[in-house]
Design a protein with these regions (language model features):
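Extended interfacial segments that mediate partner engagement and assembly in macromolecular machines
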Residues: 9-16, 26-146
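Rossmann-like S-adenosyl-L-methionine
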Residues: 180-306
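Residue-level signal for inorganic ion chemistry
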Residues: 31, 160, 202
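Internal alpha/beta scaffold segment
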Residues: 114-156, 179-204
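Flexible glycine-rich surface loops and low-complexity tracts that mediate binding to linear polymers
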Residues: 1
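Short edge beta-strands and adjacent turn/loop segments
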Residues: 154-167
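Short, aliphatic-rich beta-strand segments
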Residues: 162, 169-178, 236-240
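N-terminal cysteine/histidine-rich coordination modules
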Residues: 4-6
Length: 306
């Protein structure tokens, strides 16, 4: 009694259709609902949650409330991971017979692991982070940084992670590379710091060439600290490159306040915050309960929480 289907042709626009802001929408895998008006986006997310609980989880008696929308629909993300690749997605088929630059700095093509859309701008990314992204886009080639070829498993720079504290305006940049020697990144790191006063941390993290993840235990500081801070309510959180933190800082406060409201804490409770990351949920509710225990496997996140 369950089927999945894929769109073959668009005959008529839905009543919920809206023009997506992003010129890459539909090809880029970074977003999936930009062509729906926001209320319908929330409705479709509600449908997905119900499907997870009712059809997959078999929790048929659990009531599912409506999704709480965010005031800021664009520019809300505090973390983006961009790929630097020699496998550019060619939009114009006429280019195939021309000598073209296959280097791309952007996001994966939808449903493709091996092709990167060379994006010009990312509308869900914060404004400051976008400026840094565009600076990198203009300068990576200038500084002779070799892009990664995901098919051949060759090249130096795989990804660039940009994290931004929306309340503090602090920036962390992490270059995900395939070799331990990061000396070729020093000039571009200096250039970044000179251009953007908000940058507090520039790092490099080495991952194996055949790894499908950007997570690394070998992290080196190119400039500054190894973390930034973010403020939610009166709490200031320390965030390192590998630590999990809610990617929408403003909506995180809405979520955390809702947890307190629904839980109805009396002040004598002991709370276990499982998979706590930097401990942002536990620390937010700490003053409302007797004790909070955070449980987390990523050591850098544990250090951040402490």
């Amino acid at each position: 009694n369950y089927l999945e289907a894929y769109s073959l042709e668009k005959i008529e626009k839905s009543e919920y259709y809206t023009n997506p802001q992003c010129e890459h929408y539909g090809i880029c895998g970074g977003c999936s609902l930009q062509d729906l008006n926001y209320n319908e986006q929330l409705n479709q997310k509600n449908v997905q949650v119900k499907d997870l609980f009712y059809r997959i989880g078999k929790f048929s008696s659990i009531p599912i409330n409506n999704i709480i929308g965010c005031e800021q629909h664009y520019g809300y993300r505090n973390k983006m991971e961009f790929s630097y690749s020699s496998n550019k997605w060619i939009l114009d088929l006429n280019e195939k017979d021309q000598e073209i630059d296959n280097t791309a700095f952007g996001l994966h093509v939808k449903s493709r692991f091996d092709k990167i859309v060379d994006v010009n701008d990312c509308h869900i990314n914060g404004k400051l982070s976008n400026k840094i992204f565009q600076f990198l886009k203009q300068n990576l080639y200038k500084y002779n940084i070799i892009p990664f070829d995901i098919k051949k498993r060759t090249g130096f720079l795989r990804n660039v992670i940009i994290r931004q504290g929306h309340a503090t305006n602090q920036i962390l940049i992490n270059f995900i590379i395939t070799e331990s020697d990061n000396s070729c990144l020093i000039p571009i790191a200096k250039s970044l710091v000179s251009e953007f006063d908000e940058i507090k941390s520039v790092l490099s993290s080495t991952v194996k060439r055949n790894s499908g993840s950007s997570f690394s235990d070998e992290e080196k500081i190119l400039w500054g600290e190894d973390y930034i801070t973010e403020k939610i309510d009166e709490n200031i959180y320390k965030i390192s490159s590998n630590s999990f933190f809610q990617t929408n800082s403003k909506q995180a406060k809405v979520l955390y306040d809702l947890i307190i409201e629904i839980a109805g804490f009396k002040g004598d409770e002991i709370v276990y915050d499982l998979y706590c990351g930097t401990g942002s949920i536990g620390l937010h509710i700490a003053k409302h309960v007797k004790m909070v225990y955070g449980i987390e496997i990523v050591m850098s996140a544990v250090i951040d929480a402490i």
